[in-house]
Structure formats: structure tokens, C-alpha cells
Amino acid sequence: MTTKIKTLLDYTRDKTNFNSIERYVDYLARYIDYVAGGNVQADIVSAKEPKYHFLQYKADATHNVTRPFNSELFVGKDIFDCQRDDFFRLLKDISIAKEDDELRRTINRMVYSCQQAIGMTLDALPSAENNKAKKLNGDLFEVFIRLLIAEIGVTVKEMTEKVTVRANDQYSFDMNYQHDVMLYKGEELRAIGSVKTSSKDRGDKVFVDKFLYNKLTDLDIPHFAIYLNDVQRAGKAPKFHVNSTFLTAHFMGYTVKLNPLDGVYYCDITHLMQQNDILLKEIHTLDKLFVDDIWKFVGKEPVHSRTRYDD
């Protein structure tokens, strides 16, 4: 039976469907099958950067064109089974990727592809629902990252934290901080993370949050940021291309003059993020967080976290 875009949209719009890593991976498989089944009108190659493609849906999705996806990262039908198996093997013991660049790439590919499959599905919605779709996509990315962190054996929470601000040793007021990711060692908070599909709208905020949070609490808690990518569709049919949403000067200004973050991680790093020594030092692919840095944040060694993926 042929899958309809409406079926995929109905599934993605119900957040309860994405309550496990398996659900994200299963949805990627469904989307790959949908595309491979001849359900898209065109695969459009970016006029300026040919590794970026766009899909144009058929009449049942009013010929909408998707966001750009990196064809070098997005998992195709021909390699899906192998990538899925390696991904679940990594979740059992992330340390096996330490000296294996191909397994590190699998982390980036699978996280990127699972999330892009959701976002590209939501691109089939009418333009009047763009804001709702953007929020849903962002929420599901946050959930996915927290599920992955928990799966590799790190205690992670999401919460609104009340910070009491005192002046001259007297009560002044409370400030609420909404944290996407809080990493713990036992009961001790060890790091705070921001998770967004793009730095476009809130890239500055994470720098300010680190400065204010540590100033107000008299602590020195590491702050890090996770982004899916920083590219968006530009131009008009048939000459679509991509524009960067990464604000180089803003990032460098906050890094140099306010405070650097303790990690910035992307699934899809662009050439703009690699053009000088500061950016090369500060920005990394997502695998570095999961394989290396998260264990430094929480002060322990990687663990063989679960057994449910064992043969």
C-alpha cells in the first residue's frame, strides 16, 4: 500500500509518536521509503553548492519544496540498514567510535537524517502552519537529543530552574531559566546545554545565558550548544540555492569579548564555520560531544549503557 504524505504528516504532528530512539529511526525508514517510492516530483540540486538538494512534493502537498538537505549526510536507502545497525551498536557502547572516524560519521549522519526526515515532512504543510511546524520540529529535536544522551548512560534532565538573585545579602527576586539539557553526575549539575535546529534566532542567547547564569549563581557551570545545521533555502524555482544562517561576526564577538562556550556542536558544519582559527577551535561535529566531551563534562568514563540492542 502506497504511503500518502498526509499519513506522514499526521504521524509527525503527534509528538507522542516520538518517545524512543527506535521511533525516530523507524520514521526515517518510512520517509526514505516514501521518497524512494516515486512520491516526489523532483530532486532539485542547489545551484551554488551541489551537495545540497531540495525535494519538491507532488500535488497532494501543493508542490511544496523542502528545506535543503546535505546529500553527503542524509542516509539513503542503499546504506540505511548498515547505518542503522552501526548506530544502535554505538548506543550500546559509544567508546567504540573513539578511534573510528567512520563510526563517528554515523552518529552525525543518523541524527541529522532522523531529524531532517521530520523537518522535510513538515515542509509539506501549508505556509500558514509554518510557525507551528517550526516549533514542533524544534521540540522533537530536543527530545531526540535527550533520549540519545540518556541512552549512552548520562543523567539528563529538562527543567525550568528558579535562580534566586540577592543584592547585599538580601532577597531581591527570582529569575526562571528554561534549560533544554542539564547534565548530572549523581545529583550534581555538571553542564547545561541549548538544543536548537539552527542558531538563526537564538544563537546569541546561549552566550548571554552562560554569563548571567554563572554570575547570578556564583558557579562556573559549562554551557554548550547543539545545532542541526545553519542553512536555509534561497532563490526561486528552478534556481534554488542555500544561504547560511550562521552569523560569523556575532559568534566571534561573543566568544572573544563575552565568554566562549564550552562546546558548540553541529551535525552539518559549513565552510563558513571553518574559515579561521577561532571557529575551528570552537565548533565541532556532534560526534565529539557524544564520544569525547560529554564524559569530560560529567567526569566519568563511557559506559556500556544498555542491552536491549544486543543480538
Regions found by a protein language model. Name each.
Residues 191-192, 219-227, 262-264:
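Hydrophobic beta-strand segments of well-ordered beta-sheets in folded domains
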Residues 3-153:
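Interdomain/boundary linker segments immediately adjacent to catalytic/signaling cores
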Residues 152-174, 184:
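A short acidic/basic microdomain associated with nuclease active sites
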Residues 209-212, 242:
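Short, solvent-exposed amphipathic alpha-helical segments in soluble enzyme
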Residues 212-220:
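Arginine/glycine-rich "motif VI" loop of SF2 helicases in the C-terminal RecA-like domain
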Residues 196-209, 235-237:
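Active-site-adjacent loop/helix micro-motif of nuclease/hydrolase catalytic cores
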Residues 181-183, 190-197, 206:
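Conserved catalytic cores of phosphodiester-cleaving nucleases, focusing on short active-site segments
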Residues 229-311:
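Domain-level recognition of nuclease-like catalytic cores that cleave nucleotide substrates
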